[in-house]
Amino acid sequence: VDGHCGVTHKKSIDLNKTHYSLGLAANTYLEAGADIIAPSDMMKNTTKYLRKIFVQNGFSNSQIMSYSTKFKSHFYGPFRDVAKSSPQGFDRSSYQLPVEDKAKAIKSSISNAAQGANYLMVKPGMTSIDLIRDIKKETLLPTGAYQVSGEYASLQMLSKAKFGNYVDLLLESLTVLKRAQADFILSLIHISEPTRPS
């Protein structure tokens, strides 16, 4: 309701209640047959908490894809508008990362790896390409990139303004993420009709 990624109380995050809620949700998905859980909350020690819950509930082999380096970004705007999830009362700077702090961004992924994550991720993807190789080197874990709504919307707007072929723009944006050594890419890709590169 308030657009935050956790349970709030008096303009702050209640970490214990947030972890408890995430644990319940994750357990429901695992019981339904999910192999991988990908919590997007960016709260402190979520990966550690979920790993403990997995073991307690008999899901020791289930995997966690951590949103391990997720920035407080303006590129989430289109999604927030559609989902009506813009944060209310206070912003997300208490749990999402500042875009200017590379060391903190890498440290966050290292921490999630130590807590038991199986996969790591940078988000937004194209504004985080300088981090992927360093995170992989430090953690030895598969590290992916999330091409977020603002990135996707920019490709659509360039195409609609006749500044480029949509598929060309899309493929270039994804190729750059692969060049930056992303092991996997999450995207909002949608092609509504047959479209070919120019």
Regions found by a protein language model. Give the residues of each.
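Single conserved hydrophobic/aromatic residue that forms the stacking wall/gate
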Residues: 189-198
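Alpha/beta enzyme core
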Residues: 1-141, 146-185, 192
